[in-house]
């Protein structure tokens, strides 16, 4: 790392985080724009290591760089801008989220950033969406926290009759610390246990001599089918790390190389925490043989999730994309409303808030049995195990199967675009689509729709959204009688 001469500035508060394993992250920073001094760093979070890769002055210099030029920022209220800096001369990349907020009684511009070595660029890019989604929600909560602190401090000053306004917003740092640490832990776990980009089919169930060697045929069929129906997002739990990881690798065969790098294997010694945003992740049960998924993180996942238990061979799935996104948005709104109404820091802790309001009570039983059977995966499994194992035949057959699914998804998108004149008209008939594209089996339609959703986000809501919202509104009206 090249030597940088930091500008004169007061000492910046720093929190060192002890992480298990090697961290790819150099630091996370919270900076703000001072109308007199320009960009200033409020706080630094850095992994605790023996070797200091960046000094505090260098981190401050880099964090200040993210707010340079933001003095003329003219964004809509509530907007969050994502900036991606690649500073080759400094050997770092910076991902910064720029936003406006109230602090010390003034509206100003802030930046929440993470700094990584440039050598980690290929590692980070598949995880970019996960990190941005996490940081975005941190900012949503941070804005509320800053505004509440400002109101409380103004009231305190008025009551005490003081003329000097005290430093406000300081208590936002513990809240940010509690939210930034999980992001750092996620990146550290992905550094050590992410699924490799190039998977060997020999390490998966698809290399068995017969379909029932490693697991029951019906279980494997349900697992792969549901995995594809939920946009390739699955969580695999069990008591044996070896069994869990074998299923994880098997499911990752049906993902793209970039999506595999956004998946995580199970740790043999101790279990990781569930992380929303990963495509496939393996988790160990505790000593009692149980594992509880955190409702909040599951709801925050960008896609619905399949839950697979390798101990009892059960497969359950969340509702489809349009319903998941609908529930997710209502849940987020409910959580932020409860956060706003909280009257103390203890009440504002995420683990103590009851995420309900007058209009929305979340359904805690979000995982359902796999209701819709398919013919695509069943035909694939019937044929692939007839091929001789240990050769490249099965890998080639798998690639052909994935190509067919991709072509079907593209055909479905073009069919809908032509039928609706690229969204200008409402979609006419789902029945005709199923017949014309040979997707009469409900499971087949769900698989192709899920793949099409990843290619063209919002497709689910466009096709199923209006009938779903109408049925929800009708249900809400009936419940008022």
UniProtKB/Swiss-Prot annotation:
Its function, per the record, reads: Acts as a guanine-nucleotide releasing factor (GEF) for Rab GTPases by promoting the conversion of inactive RAB-GDP to the active form RAB-GTP. Acts as a GEF for RAB39A which enables HOPS-mediated autophagosome-lysosome membrane tethering and fusion in mammalian autophagy. Component of the C9orf72-SMCR8 complex where both subunits display GEF activity and that regulates autophagy. As part of the C9orf72-SMCR8-WDR41 (CSW) complex, functions as GEF for RAB8A and RAB39B, thereby promoting autophagosome maturation.
Query: Disulfide pairs?
Result: none
Name the principal localization, coarsely classed.
nucleus
Q: What is this protein called?
A: Guanine nucleotide exchange factor C9orf72 homolog
Location in the cell = Nucleus; Cytoplasm; Cytoplasm, P-body; Cytoplasm, Stress granule
Keyword Manganese carried by entry: no
Q: Which organism is it from?
A: Rattus norvegicus (Rat)
Sorted UniProt keywords: Autophagy, Cell projection, Cytoplasm, Cytoplasmic vesicle, Endosome, Guanine-nucleotide releasing factor, Lysosome, Nucleus, Secreted
For the region Required for the homodimerization of the C9orf72-SMCR8 complex, give the residue spans. 461-481
Stretches assigned to the uDENN C9ORF72-type domain: 23-194
Q: Where is the cDENN C9ORF72-type domain?
A: 200-343
Q: Name one Pfam family in it.
A: C9orf72-like
List residues of the dDENN C9ORF72-type domain.
370-464
Q: From which domain of life does this come?
A: Eukaryota
